[in-house]
Amino acid sequence: MSTGPLLIIWHSRTGTSEQLAQAAHQPAGADSRLLRAEEVEPEDLLAAGGYLFCCPENLASMSGEMKEMFDRCYYPVLGKIEGRPYATVIAAGSDGEGAQRQIDRIATGWRLKRVTDRWIVNTEAQEAEAILAPKTVEPEALDRARDLGTALAEGIAQGIF
């Protein structure tokens, strides 16, 4: 059983991942913490009962800031967070599978337990101007993010995971 709040770790360049992370955090309230990837320290991961990783896919890979967080924190928490639940939200202009695979491989190394289906939010941005432009997330996706945050936080708090 996990203890501690849901830790929502995010990075965003154009707003999609940030909006989704904030939406997931909003209903979870005191049962969650929202931290930008650059702010996360190993102690934050150790204190959390589970994780929601929200980031964009950039050039078929997770964003550099999210990768840097994993690089900084991987070994200090290795062997100390096994079995904790996690979920992901990937923002992508097309498929998002590269970023998803990278995070899943890291989570496997940490022996985390995926507790939701993979979720990739496709912005369909294909041209440079559209890719770089600020994004507004559709209300349906924000609702789904709120539901995800609520379910994860409640599952952790109730010892379901």
Language-model features: locations:
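Short, flexible coil/linker segments at domain boundaries that flank nucleotide/cofactor-interacting
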Residues: 1-3, 81-82
